[in-house]
Amino acid sequence: MPINFQSDSIPPKSIKLLSYNVMGFNGLRLEEGENKILNYLKDSEADIICLQEYNATTDRSLLTQRMIDRALKEYKYKNILNVGEKSSSNKIACYSKYPILSSRVLHYESSYNGSVNYEIKIDQDTVTLINNHLESNKLTKEDKVIYEEMIKSPEADKVKNGLR
């Protein structure tokens, strides 16, 4: 869910940062040769994109790393790392228009979650950026259906009364 803080003016030299749990790019599925999440990222005009639950495949009928790199070609710098104890299945990625000088996984006890520390050169400054994959809120399928209904129809009786 986007969180937007609006201002009448954008400060000079501001940086646009996008953090997104892409949830495996929706199973890497393509619709008419495109992935909606990837299109959103491409159109975001962010300077730096931090992604959690990052994934790609070599199967050309699904979303491949090559497709992602082609869509995000204006980001000259990228870093993709495995995180968590079961690290082969969970990746965190950073795509940046600014040089990524270094990256390191921040280790802590978790099966799937993790964090990566990046040092990014922005003009004359070196900025520390933490890309963090937070613990799941453990919503059930039923909870997710209710949540989607709330977003679509916030005035519905079910939402107002908190009924399942």
PLM features per residue range, with description:
Residues 2-9, 29-30, 48-147:
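Structured beta-strand-rich core segments of catalytic domains in phosphoester-bond hydrolases
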Residues 19-34, 55-58, 138-163:
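Acidic/histidine-rich helix-loop elements
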Residues 45, 72, 151-155:
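Generic secondary-structure transition motif, activating predominantly at the C-termini of alpha-helices
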